[in-house]
Amino acid sequence: MMDKGAPRGTRTGFTTGACSAAAARAAVIGLVTGQVPDHVECLLPNGDLVRFAVHDGRVDSASAHAMVIKDAGDDPDCTDKAHLTADVRLLPDLAGQVVLAGGTGVGTVTMPGLGLAVGGPAINPVPRRNIEANVRAVGAALLDEVGLEVAISVPQGEEMAKKTLNARLGILGGISILGTTGIVKPYSTAAYRASVVQGVQVAGTLGHGVVVLTTGGRTEKFVMAEMPELPEPAFVQMGDFLRYAMGAAVKAGIRKVVIGGMVGKLTKIAQGETITHAGRAEVDTGLLADLAAGLGAPPDVCDAIRGNETARYAGERMDALGLGTAFHTALAQRVIQTLRTRYPDQFELKVLVCDFEGRKIAEAP
């Protein structure tokens, strides 16, 4: 189990996939022994064997029910305390088979691009394999004679899903069953990076040949207003993860990439950063000063821009000179130049720039 004495903010938790596998394993034990256990040891995808508390265990001659309450540790996860529930029933005519199904609160896949069957449950590949492995580990004797259907459900999962990107990805009616290791690390960016990649993959299946990458909610709202002809799934909030978004676009064969952002993140992209988090690299104000000088800004303004720490300051000084649009256009052009160097002949590129109120300032080309 997790270390309850870990320093605040560092306690790990378990994924929805791990909890589903534990519930399924407990239910199968119930079918084998006639009693669902109060605790179960479950093998996680990373190879760890972990003990879970089991709730609401029930069993009859042909089915069993078990539930595991998710503990996300110190991660602020909307699925923390979710009831991952497994209902397992015998399939007399399908000896040796384990059939995975989605119940209430588990989303249904409605769009291609996720590596999951359209119309099927949103249970990702690693959790699928892990659930089946745990079922087979304790149900081998049963599977010699019958098959087993394992239905995973999550009460209140549809409400939880409203706090996720599932609807944007075409996953409707509930949450996804996720987890590549079985462990949730507090404030980990892995889940968000994965959602960015999935979003780009879905955009690649829409037939428009374009993905619109934005740095956040305000920039996305701005770009959506600029490009109303595109459906919502064509827009992906990449946050700080340009590298992963662009890599996914290459793999998806997308030929046009539109980037929407504000001066700070765009400056980092222009200077060659592909992870634009504030803690990763400082803004290259020298680059901004050079752009300003190229537009005829006085030397004292260029020196002030170079000596300041923020890109916003540069924009404000250029606005005061009446050169705001030209400055932001030059920055957008530099972003395109940098990305063309990094991804030669891969994409048609466009950059849209907005201010801190979400109003359009400039675009390129």
From Swiss-Prot:
Reaction catalyzed: Co-precorrin-5B + S-adenosyl-L-methionine = Co-precorrin-6A + S-adenosyl-L-homocysteine
GO molecular-function annotation terms?
A: cobalt-precorrin-5B C1-methyltransferase activity
Major enzyme class: transferase
Q: Which UniProt keywords apply?
A: Cobalamin biosynthesis, Methyltransferase, S-adenosyl-L-methionine, Transferase
Q: In which pathway does it act?
A: Cofactor biosynthesis; adenosylcobalamin biosynthesis; cob(II)yrinate a,c-diamide from sirohydrochlorin (anaerobic route): step 6/10
Q: What is its EC number?
A: 2.1.1.195
Tell me the Gene Ontology biological-process terms attached to this UniProt entry.
anaerobic cobalamin biosynthetic process; methylation
Similarity-based family: Belongs to the CbiD family.
Q: Mind telling me what this protein is named? A: Cobalt-precorrin-5B C(1)-methyltransferase
